[in-house]
Amino acid sequence: MNKLKSRYKVVIYDCDGVILDSIESNYVFYNRVMDFLGRPEIDRDNDDAKRVLHTYSFNDVMEYFFVGDPRREDAFNFAKTIHYRDLMPYMRMEDGFVSALDQLKGHTSLAICTNRATSMDMIIEDFGLTGYFEYVMTASQVTNPKPHPEPLLKVLDYFKIAPEDALFIGDGEVDMQAANSAGVPFISYKSHLPALARLQHHAEIVQHVFSNL
């Protein structure tokens, strides 16, 4: 493995849907807010609602569901009382993720760029990911979260690299849009979004990173 050469100086991961299968935890979180306000649960057949709650930042999701609701501030305040660790039982790590990190570490720098705000440090600790990522960019660190390119541009600035020297792996439109706007090569993970490659397993990502140009 030491003889392998990475195509990229930095590999950047989205969190939800790439590192973690967390869709159920997102439904649980926002349905608790709905229940607090006496509103019906989110329709799981509503693809647009699923897309928003799974990929957008907390503030953007709350605006999506509660814009115009006179209890909007109550919804925000209650949501902030829900602790991440209450949702952890509804999350699981994507198969093969740690193995992929073990293969990549030492050959390329690793980073995270997520629309999560305050829970990422706990996720890294609770899922045994401490020590893998040199830089973690969250929605709380930027003025404009994904789909704006600001988070990815800040990652590039941290590593002092050109956009083409990074690879961003995401599963949502916000990831694709941010990557395109920042000029960063994009891999679509378990989705059919337009991308440099559409891959289903983390082992395939490793193969791509070490493949010949």
Task: Tell what function each PLM region has.
Residues 13, 110, 166-168:
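Short glycine- and Lys/Arg-enriched binding-loop motifs that mark or flank ligand-binding interfaces
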Residues 113-114:
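Conserved phosphate-coupling serine/threonine residues in phosphotransfer and NTP-handling enzymes
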Residues 1-9, 117, 121-213:
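Asp-based, Mg2+/Mn2+-dependent phosphohydrolase catalytic module
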Residues 3-98, 102-106:
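N-terminal helical cap/lid subdomain that shapes the substrate entry/recognition surface
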Residues 106-107, 182:
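Conserved dinucleotide-binding and phosphotransfer motif residues
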Residues 109-110, 185:
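Residue-level detector of anion-binding/catalytic polar loops
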